[in-house]
Amino acid sequence: MSKKFEQIYNKSITKPEEFWREISEDIFWFKKPTKILNKSNPPFYKWFEDGTTNTCYNALDFHIDNGLGEKTALIYDSPITSNKAKFTYNELKSKVSKFAGALKNQGLQKGDRA
């Protein structure tokens, strides 16, 4: 194990709130969290409970907004079927939007878990 990896890992174990606060700086937040970890109801811990983010935005829109829309976002390479495909951020966002629309048509609403 590399020395750097070991240092990062140890910090994540010994100082989890400090570690994840630093990591959270690399994520786009609509509302930045002030509470990193709530341990009041173990083992049901709550992370970033007062923050608001969106995984899809961080995975796709953020990169498109920063000029990477035509760059490859996903490479599909199936060892079973030998099918291969590449998707740009723009293409992937279009497919995700269509799927989100299908879920909405099935009654899924904001805040639901799918």
Where are these regions (language model features)?
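Active-site diphosphate/adenylate-binding microenvironment
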Residues: K32-N54
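Conserved AMP-binding/adenylate-forming core of the ANL superfamily
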Residues: C56, L74-R113
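Short, contiguous pre-domain boundary segments
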Residues: M1-Q7
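A short N-terminal helical cap/helix-turn-helix that marks the beginning
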Residues: I13-K31, G51-I75
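A non-catalytic, amphipathic alpha-helix used as a structural packing/dimerization or gating element
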Residues: Q7, K11-E18, E91-K98
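Short amphipathic alpha-helical segments
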Residues: F5, E70-T72, I80
